[in-house]
Amino acid sequence: MSDFQKSFSESTSSIKFDEKYIDNSVQPNDIGVAEQWAVKTVADPCVGNLATPVNSGYFTKAFINNLPFYREGISPNFRGLETGAAFGYLLYGPFTMTGPLRNSEFALTAGLLAAIGAVHILTALLVLYNAPGKAPNVQPPDATVNNPPKDLFTRAGWADFTSGFWLGGCGGSVFAWLLVGTLHLDTIMPIIKNIWTAG
C-alpha cells in the first residue's frame, strides 16, 4: 500500500460531499424501474416457476389468457371446437403441399384425408389422457395464467373438450379444403408445388 493510500485508510474523518451533489430522494432500498424486471418466485420457490418479464409481462399474459384453452366464460366443448378448428385448418396445408400425392390431381383430397387422419390421432391422444384410473391434472394458478378453467380439468369437461376438438378439427380441415378448392389458385399452385420438387 502506498503512502497516499495509507493516509486515506488511517484517517478517521468521513468524506464530505458538497450538498448540491447529494440526491436525498433516493433511499437505500429504492431500486426504481428495476423492481418491475426483478425475477420473483410465484408461490413456492421449490416449484421452479419464476415470474420473469417474459412469462408475466403484459403482452404474454394477454396473449396466453386469450387462447381458447384459458379464455374465461366458454364451455369445454367450445374450447375444444375452437382449438380443433385451428389445428385442422393448419394441418391441411402441409399435408396437401408436401404429401406424396402433391403432383397429382388428387393432392387436395389427399391433403384433406391426411389432415382428418391426423386430427383423429390427436383426438385419440386426448382420449388416452382422460383414460380410466386417473383424472386430468389440474393446473395451479401461476405467473402467466391467474385463473385456469376449473371445469375443463374434470373427466366430463375433458371428454367435452375432446369431442369438440374432433368436430372442430374435421370441420377446420374441410373448411381449408373448400377454400383451396374454390379459389382460383390454378396459377399459383404449380409455382408452389415446384418449390419442393426443384433440386
From Swiss-Prot:
InterPro entries: PSI_PsaL, PSI_PsaL_sf, PSI_suXI. Its main location: membrane. It is a multi-pass membrane protein. The chain crosses the membrane at residues 108-128, 165-185. One of its GO terms (biological process) is photosynthesis. It is found in: Cellular thylakoid membrane. Keywords: Membrane, Photosynthesis, Photosystem I, Thylakoid, Transmembrane, Transmembrane helix. SUPFAM superfamilies: Photosystem I reaction center subunit XI, PsaL. PANTHER family: PHOTOSYSTEM I REACTION CENTER SUBUNIT XI, CHLOROPLASTIC. Belongs to the PsaL family. This is Photosystem I reaction center subunit XI. The lineage of its organism: Bacteria, Bacillati, Cyanobacteriota, Cyanophyceae, Synechococcales.
